[in-house]
């Protein structure tokens, strides 16, 4: 099988993003239509549902990076205080042939990092304070190169949209559970032995069980191969696979989970923020395998 060019990979990521948005819109409409039917909202409910889906898709596409950054408490990195970090980001971005992304900091002891945005002109890189404290310049450069690779390969749009959508799925689960117990509205089936309420209870229970699985499946849709590709691309950008390999080794040895994160955003990070190895639906390859592949690269 022939290798894909960078432009083919970028185009594929954009297509997958649009396909994901369309698929999710259909699922969301099906769930929303049940609420419209159950609470007897009629045509008004359908119109409001359609407006909500369009608005949410716009937010997911245009504002997902801001949502992702805000959800983890990231703040802009002061150029004077974090001069070395800004310098490394600028150097790596120049070597990768993309504009310098915005630079953010997370007050977090776990060494980690992620990139977000919709394209290379509207992108951000965020690192934890723990990463800055633990890494030397070569290791930090390797981590930044990995994240810059996600930007250059246009992984970031799909990854960030998935994070926002996964967050909505979790929210829908909570709304479904609350509506089950609070019994909001009047069902058109209430006259018939509360059949509507029973149906909602059953659907709510099912959805509350499968919602976390949906989140895991969505996260795993972000192929593990993207991480391998970003590792390799980053190594070639800075002409050094050992900096990132050493950084991953230190990251892998840190097992304490991150204080502020969620299942919705876990796949964005360079390493699993929960500080544990996941086998089923894992979005990150084993760190040991990533290190092995990096050390086998020839520059």
Swiss-Prot record:
Work out whether the entry's keyword set contains Membrane: yes
The GO terms this record gives for MF are:
metalloendopeptidase activity; zinc ion binding
- Cofactor binding comment, as recorded: Binds 1 zinc ion per subunit.
Q: What is its EC number?
A: 3.4.24.-
The answer to whether the entry has keyword Transmembrane is yes
- The main location is membrane
* Membrane-spanning intervals of the chain: 19-39, 41-61, 156-176, 198-218
For this UniProt record, give its keywords in alphabetical order, as a comma-separated list. Answer: Cell membrane, Hydrolase, Membrane, Metal-binding, Metalloprotease, Protease, Transmembrane, Transmembrane helix, Zinc
Q: Can you cite a GO biological process for this protein?
A: proteolysis
One GO location term (cellular component)? plasma membrane
| Lineage: superkingdom | Bacteria
Give the bilayer topology.
Multi-pass membrane protein
Report the subcellular localization: Cell membrane
Q: What are the names of the required cofactors?
A: Zn(2+)
Residues at which Zn(2+) binds: 146, 150, 227
Active-site residue numbers: 147
Instruction: State the family named in the UniProt similarity comment for this chain.
Output: Belongs to the peptidase M48B family.
NCBIfam families, alphabetized? PRK04897.1
Q: Which HAMAP family match?
A: Pept_M48_protease_HtpX
Q: What is this protein called?
A: Protease HtpX homolog
**Species in which this protein is naturally found:** Thermoanaerobacter sp. (strain X514)
């Amino acid at each position: 099988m022939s290798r894909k060019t960078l432009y083919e990979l970028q185009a594929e990521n954009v297509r997958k993003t649009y396909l994901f948005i369309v698929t999710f819109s259909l699922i969301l409409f099906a769930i929303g239509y049940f609420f419209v039917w159950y609470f007897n909202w009629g045509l008004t409910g359908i119109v409001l549902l359609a407006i909500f889906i369009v608005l949410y898709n716009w937010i997911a596409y245009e504002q997902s990076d801001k949502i992702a950054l805000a959800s983890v408490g990231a703040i802009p990195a002061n150029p004077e205080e974090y001069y070395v970090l800004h310098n490394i980001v600028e150097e790596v971005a120049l070597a990768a042939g993309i504009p310098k992304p915005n630079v953010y900091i997370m007050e977090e002891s776990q060494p980690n990092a992620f990139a977000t945005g919709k394209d290379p002109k509207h992108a951000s890189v965020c690192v934890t304070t723990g990463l800055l404290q633990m890494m030397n310049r070569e290791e930090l450069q390797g981590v930044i190169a990995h994240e810059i690779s996600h930007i250059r390969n246009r992984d970031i749009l799909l990854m960030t949209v998935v994070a926002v959508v996964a967050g909505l799925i979790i929210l829908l689960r909570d709304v479904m559970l609350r509506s089950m117990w609070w019994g909001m509205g009047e069902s058109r089936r209430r006259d018939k032995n509360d059949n509507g309420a029973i149906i909602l209870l059953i659907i709510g229970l099912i959805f509350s069980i499968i919602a976390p699985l949906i989140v895991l499946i969505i996260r795993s849709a972000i192929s593990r191969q993207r991480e391998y590709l970003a590792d390799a691309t980053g190594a070639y950008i800075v002409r050094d696979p050992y900096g990132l390999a050493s950084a991953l080794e230190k990251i892998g040895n840190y097992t304490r989970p991150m204080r502020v994160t969620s299942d919705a955003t876990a796949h964005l990070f360079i390493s699993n923020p929960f500080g544990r190895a996941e086998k089923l639906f894992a979005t990150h390859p084993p760190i040991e395998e990533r290190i092995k592949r990096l050390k086998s690269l020839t520059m």
